[in-house]
Design a protein with these regions (language model features):
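Short, Lys/Arg-enriched N-terminal segments with co-localized hydrophobic residues
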Residues: 1-8
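A helix-coil-helix interface module used to build multimeric assemblies
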Residues: 8-208, 216-225
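Short linear loop/turn motifs
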Residues: 67-70, 236-241
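Glycine-rich anion/phosphate-binding loop at the beta-strand->alpha-helix junction
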Residues: 188, 192, 238-256
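FAD-binding core of flavoproteins
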Residues: 211
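Solvent-exposed alpha-helices and their adjacent loops that cap or buttress functional pockets
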Residues: 214-215, 240
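Active-site-adjacent "gating/activation" loops or surface patches in catalytic cores
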Residues: 219-239
């Protein structure tokens, strides 16, 4: 397997402004790898599409693009097999991927970030990750509703007391009680679908740090390839918006 040297990744990002070694506590404070390593698959998915767009637009060569895509695939394979592990000393998952990629394919790896900022990259990664989580949760809800409906159908004549204000009020069936939860969960499902649809409406990639880039990017291409309806119309909104996170958290809290 391929190895990436420890202790260097986080330091390389910060050493340029300092004459002495950066204190480990500073690196630890600035590091987000423990949180954002869960986004590594989505980060590489976005990078692959970004590389394809750069080659399509003539910003990087086809050879660079091929090397980048094969390098990303090899990283994914080695992570899956255990031949490669995420460096806990890396500042973030994006740095880990880029430096691992460059170690494997050379200078082509350095050209991957052309026309892209950490800001639009992170905004994209979060959307892709939450979309995947939302789809997983939606599938779980659908399966749970199916089980509830099946059990309710088996208990259409099983009588039980219905309560109001902690007092027995009216006789109902166990099936009727179960179906109340099925209907609640179906509303939860709609909330997840609605939040995800809004998340998928606009792709932030290409927004740059906050005001785009002078590179001739094809934002429609990347938006479509990544499953978005369109590029976000305002670059500042694209990189600063996090209301989709709150919306999904709201749907989760109601479901719980």
């Amino acid at each position: 397997g391929h190895k990436v040297k420890d202790k260097t990744m986080a330091e390389q990002l910060w050493k340029g402004r300092f004459s002495k070694a950066v204190d480990s506590r500073v690196n630890d404070f600035n590091s987000s790898i423990r949180f954002d390593q869960r986004m590594i698959a989505q980060d590489m998915r976005g990078s692959g599409v970004h590389a394809a767009m750069l080659a399509k637009q003539g910003i990087i060569s086809e050879k660079d693009c091929e090397d980048i895509l094969s390098g990303l695939a090899s990283i994914a394979d080695d992570l899956a097999s255990g031949a490669l592990t995420i460096d806990p000393n890396a500042e973030d998952v994006h740095t880990f991927v880029e430096q691992t990629l460059t170690a494997r394919i050379g200078d082509a790896g350095k050209r991957l970030h052309t026309g892209r900022s950490r800001n639009d990259q992170v905004a994209l990664d979060i959307r892709l990750t939450l979309r995947d989580y939302s789809h997983t949760l939606q599938a779980y809800i659908v399966e749970l509703v199916k089980v509830i409906c099946r059990k309710a159908a088996e208990n259409t004549t099983a009588v039980m007391p219905g309560y109001t204000h902690l007092q027995r009020a009216q006789p109902i069936t166990f099936g009727h009680a179960l179906m109340a939860y099925a209907w609640m969960l179906l509303r939860d499902l709609q909330r997840f679908e609605d939040a995800t649809a809004r998340m998928d409406a606009q792709c932030p990639l290409g927004s740059g740090a906050l005001a785009g880039t002078t590179y001739p990017l094809d934002r429609q291409f990347t938006a479509e390839k990544l499953g978005f309806a369109a590029p976000c119309p305002n670059s500042l909104d694209g990189v600063s918006d996090r209301d989709f996170c709150i919306e999904l958290a709201n749907a989760i809290s109601i479901c719980m």
